[in-house]
Amino acid sequence: MSTPTSPTPKTAEVPARQPWPRGRRRTVALAVGTLVAASGLVSAAGYEAYHASTPSPAVTHHEKADGTTVIIPAASQNPIPLHGRIDTVDYQQEYQGVTYKKQALVYVPATYVQGVPANIAYLTHGWMSSAEEMADEVSPAIDDLERSGALSPTIVVFATYYPDRSFVNDDFETDYQLNRFFATSEINTLIDTIESRYSTYADGDTTDESLKASRTHRAFGGFSMGGITAWDVFALNPDYFYGYMPMAGESWIGRDHDAPLPQIADEVTLGVRSRGMGPQDFRIIASVGSDDPALDDMNPQLGEFYRRYPTLMTSQSLQVWIDEGGTHSLASVSRQ
């Protein structure tokens, strides 16, 4: 995963190995903030100043009398529950002729008011992981931003691409079929379920027209295989999202036919190009740890995106953040 450094990714003359910006910040929280800032709702500089001065908390869990669970920063002498809350939302998804009962975890900020639209971000995990694990790592960082007032009201949805846990196995490559399905089909089910329940800029209307009109207030991200999912969403389903956060994952578009880098760049950008979108119509924050093997997979693609489409993939529309010393782990995600 990565961290932002001022816009330094180059657009045209990109060396074989790009010297991406490096540092240590909490990627997911800051990325959500930056994507929100890109819509003019909050200052990105404010996010960076906040994160530079705020340590990443350890967390513990406490079950309340009513059976709900709160996540508590363990580092504090007087632990305080999340300022916001975590809801569990049930939905059903059909996959290969079978209907599965699924759950998503929804971080709802304390600043949320029913009837007042909030921004929304959808996040998914990596191989063998779960929505619960990602929520545990990321929610405290998001909550810190909400509590400080640095983040405009933003709902964060943690979802799994596994129909159920029987799909988890020791071959991560088999996940890609599920990643593709989630990016092109299940995400639509999830949006319909979540945004008909919570107040977002879709205003309860999950028709195609409404979701397109409210896309600047919606982002999608993921870690590892979830990052690969994020690239699929950008390539194949860009109508509903403005922001994308692929963390420690390159695009697998074209993998089934061993596409060379120029063709991968063509296929990844085809969705926005075919819709007449320009660099002002999306923001990608691609992040990875400096000690993560995924960096070597992402680096050639990112360089090719800048090279082949310099007026589309600019230093603003495609940002690359590197977490110095970061590995392929959720700990790196939360730290960045």
PLM regions and their residue ranges:
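Terminal targeting segments of Actinobacterial cell-envelope proteins
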Residues: M1-R25
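Non-catalytic cap/lid and distal C-terminal segments of serine-dependent acyl enzymes
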Residues: A29-G33, A38-Q336
